[in-house]
From Swiss-Prot:
Cross-referenced InterPro entries: Apolipo_AcylTrfase, C-N_Hydrolase, C-N_Hydrolase_sf, LNT_N
Protein name: Apolipoprotein N-acyltransferase 1
Membrane topology: Multi-pass membrane protein
Organism: Leptospira interrogans serogroup Icterohaemorrhagiae serovar copenhageni (strain Fiocruz L1-130)
UniProt-listed CDD domains: ALP_N-acyl_transferase
Any single Gene Ontology cellular-component annotation: plasma membrane
Length: 576
């Protein structure tokens, strides 16, 4: 009936489907997280692909280009402002880059459609679509480069039960699941009147598979809640702060009043007001911008080292007996590193992880060597150098740690005073005697947490992480929608790894999830100032299937499906 009014070949029909994908995407992602919206987006994608099959591939690609920009304007409209604030580019350049971003980040639709088109499926009622459509979409998710990554699997966030499937197949497995559910729905709708048909029976078999996955999700939610190690529980008390300080633009680097106010705010929030001190204090990315705590000649020369910043970290640890996790910048052989650092109360030493996945045009300038003039356009862009290796940060829980006052607070800019306190042999020996346990942190800096591959790296070694901590600075984006989309994508890392995840953001959203991706605290909202004190369990019973095998089986499965279909199509064409 619908097609009596709108032709499948019409511009209006295709525009409606493009907007269906865009609107379904924005409402499928956080903070809305409507499961039905994700299904709606994927079904719109199916019908768009069938409509594009009726035209030339070049016209189809033109429509996919239009789709990429519609997605930009509906789901990621905050990007132009973010580009301007992060890089210092003017409005014209930011808008131009916005269009370019839409093309690059949505290249997956071009691959997705190409795989689908050459699979020669001529109708949404064909049962082949049950596997071909999900396999093509999942492969395109896994292969194509994205700057701010979103996957079809992120659109399943409205169902915490289905999300548990990520512990087996990761976010890409959720992509396959969502597209499989949508394809099953279409087959079922087309053949529900023909209950004796092969197609209807196939759709019922698909529904049974989906029901098994749902049952697994229910089981995992209950199982993890009941399977904590009660014999030797490892409870880690944490204090997380959100200072909501303004972004550190380059013109503020020499502003003493700005830096003083920023450091004072961080310091006042991080000093616990309760009787029981935490074992770990988490300070978000760029809470204290521009500076680092390594007192080296090159850091002093470039005015990166801050004695006050070092004094604050030492004071907090001495006052509370806690380890302190924070973000800093340091020069390492003339290479500027963006780091997650853990100051350890046990021995007064600092472990550091160098950020590996840098943000283009924010933390480094692509092609700057070939086009040096770009620096004059993107003036706020930093010159960070990426790290090469994953690195766990090892903290320590010490028994009977009590809050007490270290040397005078007036000496914050004289860290040598505090360093001396940590060098006491007697005190160090006493701490070792009272060491309860050590714990391992998987550090993720800013949007690194959106890339599941960066997390899987840590599970290839003998020593495994016990908690994921993502410190981030979303204040550059100044968009509540972006903050929720970023946070929602990060949450899946907890389910994939079966580990608790702490997300500390300088301006929000700051959250904590357990191994099932279920919130453990009331989040600190966007542009709120606050703290959260909580306790997490670090006694994961076993690794998830996903951390043991990664994406290998899903790669093989999707490739075999598409190759089998292409072989089948080529044989049919030869016979004809």
């Amino acid at each position: 009936m619908f097609y009596n009014f709108i032709s499948k070949d019409s511009i209006l029909y295709r525009l409606i489907l493009c907007f269906g994908i865009g609107i379904g995407t924005v409402f499928g992602l956080s903070p809305f997280s409507f499961f039905s919206a994700g299904v709606f987006a994927s079904i719109s994608c199916i019908f768009l692909f069938f409509s594009l099959n009726r035209t030339s591939i070049w016209k189809a690609f033109l429509w996919l280009l239009i789709l990429s920009q519609i997605l930009n304007f509906t789901a990621f409209y905050w990007i132009p402002g973010a580009i301007s604030r992060i890089s210092g580019a003017n409005t014209f350049v930011s808008i131009l880059f916005f269009f370019l971003y839409g093309l690059i980040s949505h290249l997956k639709f071009f691959l997705f459609y190409t795989l689908f088109r050459f699979s020669k499926i001529d109708s949404a009622s064909k049962t082949y679509i049950l596997l071909i459509f999900p396999a093509a979409g999942t492969l395109s998710d896994m292969i194509t480069f994205q700057i701010f990554p979103w996957y079809w699997g992120n659109l399943i966030s409205g169902s915490i039960v289905f999300e548990q499937f990520a512990s087996i197949c990761g976010v890409y497995g959720l992509s396959f699941l969502l597209l499989f559910i949508s394809s099953t729905f279409l087959i079922l709708v087309n053949y529900y009147k023909y209950k004796n048909s092969k197609e209807f029976k196939t759709s019922i078999a698909s529904l049974i598979c989906i029901a098994f996955i749902y049952r697994f999700g229910l089981y995992r939610i209950g199982y993890i809640n009941q399977s904590q190690n009660e014999l030797k529980p490892k409870n880690l008390s944490v204090l997380m702060i959100q200072p909501d300080t303004s972004p550190g633009t380059k013109d503020l680097k020499a502003d003493a009043s700005y830096l003083s106010a920023t450091m004072s705010k961080v310091f006042s929030l991080a000093i616990p007001t309760f009787e029981n001190s935490p074992s770990l204090i988490v300070i978000p990315e760029s809470a204290i911008p521009f500076h680092g705590t390594i007192d080296s000649e090159e850091n002093r020369k470039e005015k990166i080292y801050s004695s006050t910043m070092e004094g604050i970290i030492l004071y907090l640890s001495k006052h509370t007996g806690a380890d302190v996790l924070f973000n800093e910048l340091n020069l390492d052989e003339n290479k500027l590193r963006n780091q997650v650092s853990l100051f350890k109360n046990l021995d007064g030493k600092t472990e550091r992880y160098n950020k590996r996945r840098l943000l283009p045009f924010g933390e480094y300038l692509p092609m700057e060597k070939n086009f040096p003039f770009l620096r004059s356009i993107f003036q706020e862009t930093s010159r960070y150098v990426p790290g090469e290796f994953p690195k766990l940060l090892i903290g320590n829980k010490i028994q009977n740690q009590r809050s007490f006052l270290p040397p005078e607070i007036s000496k914050l800019n004289e860290p040598k005073t505090y360093r001396y306190e940590f060098s006491s042999i007697v005190e160090h020996t006493n701490k070792i005697r009272n060491l309860e346990y050590s714990y391992s942190i998987l550090p993720l800096l800013c949007y690194e947490a959106m890339f599941t591959e960066l997390v899987l790296d840590y599970f290839q070694n003998e020593q495994k992480p016990e908690v994921l901590i993502n410190i981030t600075n979303d204040s550059w984006f100044d968009s509540e929608l972006e903050a929720y989309q970023h946070s929602g994508a990060v949450r899946l890392r907890a389910i994939e790894t079966g580990l608790p995840l702490i997300r500390s953001a300088v301006s929000g959203i700051s959250e904590v999830w357990d191994a099932r991706g279920i919130p453990m605290i009331v989040p600190i909202g966007f542009h709120e100032t606050g703290t959260r004190a909580f306790s997490i369990r670090l006694d994961a019973i076993e690794s998830t299937i996903y951390t043991r095998f990664g994406n290998s089986f899903l790669w093989i499965f999707c490739i075999l499906i598409l190759i089998s279909r292409l072989i089948f199509v080529s044989r049919i064409e030869r016979k004809s």
